Amino acid sequence: MSYYAFEGLIPVVHPDAFVHPSAVLIGDVIVGAGVYIGPLASLRGDYGRLILEAGSNLQYGCIMHGYCDTDTIVHENGHIGHGAILHGCVVGRDALVGMNSVIMDGAVIGEESIVAAMSFVKAGFQGEARQLLVGSPARVLRQVTDQELHWKRLNTKEYQDLAIRCRTGLSETKPLTQVEENRPRLKGTTDVKPKSAQ
């Protein structure tokens, strides 16, 4: 892992969290219990404070940053998809930010909301609970259904379990030169399926 103190502030990582060795945490970063931080994530706490609350995840290639005197927060069980950028915003409890989405300064994503992949949430947006946000700029399409929230929670549970699995089952290695016979397949811990397969 790459951890850097910045002007005396050292990242804080709960012992039950998993931070991938290629992720970078700088300065005023606080990571809660059971959090998963994926490969190549960059958390730059060199201006504002960055907080990932318990059970949340920040997947590979994500960026967190914010201005001075602001907190960028992912609340409990928040789910941040691959390549998303969070800048000076707040993501509510049990909300999902889809892959390659951007959430700008002062924006608030309401609890149990879903931001669709590739969406751009403008600075200052003030969301409410269980909104489905879509587009660039993002607009409220409708309320999140119970089925969608269940799907989101299964995905978040996969990442909470992945934090545990990675602490015990991830190790650096050298590649094989050919595929072994009867190569096994990995399995998740829930019955979650891609939305296209539902």
From Swiss-Prot:
The segments labelled Disordered in the record are 179-198
User: Basic and acidic residues bias: where?
Assistant: 180-198
Q: Tell me which Pfam families the record gives.
A: Hexapep (PF00132)
Recorded metabolic or biological pathway in which this protein acts: Amine and polyamine metabolism; carnitine metabolism
Q: State a single Gene Ontology molecular function.
A: transferase activity
Q: What keywords appear on the UniProt entry? A: Repeat, Transferase
- Name the Gene3D superfamilies on file: Hexapeptide repeat proteins
GO BP, one example? Answer: carnitine metabolic process
- Is the keyword rRNA-binding assigned to this protein? no
Cited HAMAP family: CaiE
Its family remark reads: Belongs to the transferase hexapeptide repeat family.
Function in brief = Overproduction of CaiE stimulates the activity of CaiB and CaiD.
Q: What is this protein called?
A: Carnitine operon protein CaiE
Could you tell me which species this protein originates from? Salmonella paratyphi B (strain ATCC BAA-1250 / SPB7)
